Regions:
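Detector for the mature cores of small, proteolytically processed
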Residues: 79-81, 86
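Cysteine-rich micro-motifs
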Residues: 104-116
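Short cysteine-rich clusters marking metal-coordination/redox-active sites
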Residues: 90-93, 110
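Short metal-coordination and nucleic-acid-contact micro-motifs, chiefly zinc-binding Cys/His arrays
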Residues: 86-89, 97, 103-106
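Long, charged N-terminal interaction/targeting segments
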Residues: 1-76
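Short functional micro-motifs and their immediate structural scaffolds
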Residues: 96-101, 115-118
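Extended, charged helical/alpha-beta scaffold domains that provide interaction surfaces
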Residues: 4-5, 118-121
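Catalytic-core loop-and-flanking beta/alpha module that positions acidic residues
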Residues: 84, 92-95, 119
């Protein structure tokens, strides 16, 4: 049986017409969903349907914005800051986390969740 984090280690969802906020939120690990929910909803309020791609790789969240959006430059800056912050937030609980180089997929985890994850992998 896979670890509950496994589906989130590498994930890409794209739609050129815009991803609904509900789709983005339901495809985030719970720690990131809780931490970034408000910001993602505000991005959509400012520029509806501007988020066209969600990508999770190596413990970092990437959200791409439609280039034809009126607020493309602003949204790109906001989503870039969100990506940088996601690299310091535990995917499981939303507390401070970090990516460890020795991990194959480098999930961003706090110490307790990291220990749980490596113990699970070794079992």
């Amino acid at each position: 049986m896979p670890h509950s984090l496994t589906p989130y280690l590498s994930r890409t969802i794209a739609d050129d017409t815009g991803l609904p906020v509900s789709t983005i939120l339901m495809n985030l690990p719970v720690g990131w969903e809780n931490k970034f929910r408000t910001l993602i909803m505000e991005i959509d309020d400012i520029s509806p349907s501007s988020m066209v791609k969600l990508d999770i790789r190596d413990g970092v969240l990437y959200i791409s914005v439609n280039e034809s959006s009126k607020y493309h430059k602003l949204m790109t800056l906001v989503t870039r800051a969100l990506s940088q912050e996601s690299a310091r937030v535990c995917m499981m609980c939303g507390e401070f986390g970090k990516r460890r180089k020795e991990q194959e997929h480098k999930p961003c985890l706090c110490r307790p969740h990291y220990l749980d994850y490596i113990n699970y992998e070794e079992a």
